[in-house]
């Protein structure tokens, strides 16, 4: 029985899809004006994990994650670069997909782009105007009337009165209330625009997600996800728009993943601790980065540091050492481990406990390796099966353990030296065997002898 922490109710709830076994999930995706940073990677990996477990559990999932391809940041960056906004977004979308591929993130079933849904935005905005939830002051803009929506603040638990008192908002004469937010922005010089009933312009950010989600999944759906930084105002405003327009509950459950902290501090460009996924992958194996992102519970903040990455690398090395030398066979045995893993994942996707199960499984594989290699191989298959839920442990063990050797050592030379050492050992020429080992050690190569064979990896 799967339980999910619902930000809307602030409690864990038993998950019950709206339509039998079918699950519809929408996640706020990238605003594609720059390369993906680690925070984006955290959200992508978190909901990839949710996707994998829902499907592993037998649900028929439709996963939609949008692309915001028109926005102030996009326009500003395109102008800085001297390129069109669509040239910039096309380039950044390609880069995003490459980052996802390297992190073993499954593509969503649908990936709608805001600029493909302008007509739908016009329709929803007009509905809101007709119902009195929005107004056009005549300057080309259209605003949402926050005070009219009775449920405003139900996601974030913020009260309109408190927001007004604490608001530090520039006075906008066109707004009836400082808290009102824009649905449609009138055209400005040098900006892309689309025709609309209120004059040329472009959509506000919040209306984009309301329209794309409901167009792809229907007026009500099961799960809406995103980073915790989107809870207010973005997700709060989505609820206000969508429920005012349709008269129905928008999303049944709201899931929010935690933020990335860098050495204990918030990641930001001003603190000079801002890392793109590409920056990190230049230094660390993609699977190490992914494991760092899945080993913590999705709602927790992750502290990114050299130590945390070394810990992630060490964990994966333990897993792959257990797999090394065992044939790839179908998963067999270890039902108790599967049950514990399932209990952990069904408790709001409890990956820390699930990872602990993998470590226990590794200990059992190592215990059986010599005494019952067939059973050990079956459990190794089980380790890969459970690892696949986390998006890890699908590589050949040697490939992972030797990752990074390219450009540092000549693999053919290493293999040649290993064969020469094996021959020296067969000839009982221990001095030559030790000399070759010392030579390999000086090259940064660690040898591991087992039953007449020798494998190798690079030293940390």
From Swiss-Prot:
| Residues that, per the record, bind ATP | 269
Its Enzyme Commission number?
Answer: 6.1.1.16
Give the motif span ('KMSKS' region): 266-270
**Binding positions (Zn(2+)):** 28, 209, 234, 238
Keyword Nucleotide-binding carried by entry:
yes
What SMART domains would the database entry show? DALR_2 (SM00840)
Keywords attached to this entry = Aminoacyl-tRNA synthetase, ATP-binding, Cytoplasm, Ligase, Metal-binding, Nucleotide-binding, Protein biosynthesis, Zinc
The GO annotation for biological process reads: cysteinyl-tRNA aminoacylation
Q: Give the quaternary structure.
A: Monomer.
Query: What NCBIfam families does this protein's entry cite?
Result: cysS
The protein's name is Cysteine--tRNA ligase
- Recorded source organism is Pseudomonas putida (strain ATCC 700007 / DSM 6899 / JCM 31910 / BCRC 17059 / LMG 24140 / F1)
């Amino acid at each position: 029985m799967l339980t999910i922490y619902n930000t809307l109710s602030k409690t864990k709830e038993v998950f019950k899809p709206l339509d039998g076994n079918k699950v519809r999930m929408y996640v706020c995706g990238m605003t594609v004006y720059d390369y993906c940073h680690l925070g984006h990677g955290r959200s992508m990996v978190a909901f990839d994990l949710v996707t994998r477990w829902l499907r592993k559990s037998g649900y028929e999932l439709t996963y939609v994650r949008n692309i915001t391809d028109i926005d102030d940041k996009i326009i500003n960056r395109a102008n800085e670069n001297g390129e069109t906004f669509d040239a910039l977004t096309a380039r950044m979308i390609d880069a995003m997909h490459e980052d996802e591929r390297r992190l073993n993130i499954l593509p969503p079933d649908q990936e709608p782009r805001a600029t493909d849904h302008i007509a739908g935005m016009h329709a929803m905005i007009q509905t809101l105007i007709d119902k009195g939830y929005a107004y056009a002051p005549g300057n080309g803009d259209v605003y949402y009337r926050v005070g009219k929506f009775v449920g405003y603040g139900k996601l974030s638990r913020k009260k309109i009165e408190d927001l007004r008192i604490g608001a530090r908002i520039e006075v906008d004469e066109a707004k009836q209330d400082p808290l009102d937010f824009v649905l449609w922005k009138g055209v400005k010089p040098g900006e892309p625009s689309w025709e609309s009933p209120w004059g040329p312009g472009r959509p506000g950010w919040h209306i984009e997600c309301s329209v794309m989600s409901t167009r792809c999944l229907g007026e009500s759906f099961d799960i809406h996800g995103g980073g915790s930084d989107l809870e207010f105002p973005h997700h709060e405003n989505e609820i206000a728009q969508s429920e005012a327009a349709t008269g129905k509950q928008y999303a049944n459950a709201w899931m929010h993943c935690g933020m990335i902290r860098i050495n204990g501090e918030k990641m930001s460009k001003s603190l000079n601790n801002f890392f793109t996924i590409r920056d990190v992958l230049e230094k660390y194996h993609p699977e190490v980065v992914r494991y760092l992102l899945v080993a913590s519970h999705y709602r927790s903040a992750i502290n990114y540091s050299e130590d945390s990455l070394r810990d992630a690398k060490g964990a994966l090395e333990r897993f792959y050492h257990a797999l090394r030398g065992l044939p790839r066979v179908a998963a067999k045995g270890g039902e108790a481990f599967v049950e514990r893993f399932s209990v952990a994942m069904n408790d709001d996707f409890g990956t820390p406990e699930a990872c602990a199960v993998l470590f226990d499984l590794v200990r059992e594989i190592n215990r059986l390796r010599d005494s019952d290699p067939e059973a050990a191989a079956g459990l190794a298959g089980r380790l890969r099966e459970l690892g696949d839920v986390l998006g890890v442990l699908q590589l050949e063990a040697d490939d992972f353990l030797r990752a990074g050797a390219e450009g540092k050592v000549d693999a053919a030379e290493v293999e040649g030296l290993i064969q020469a050492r094996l021959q020296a050992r067969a000839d009982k020429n221990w001095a030559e065997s030790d000399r070759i080992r010392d030579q390999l050690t000086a090259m940064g190569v660690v040898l591991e002898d087992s039953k007449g064979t020798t494998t190798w990896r690079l030293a940390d």
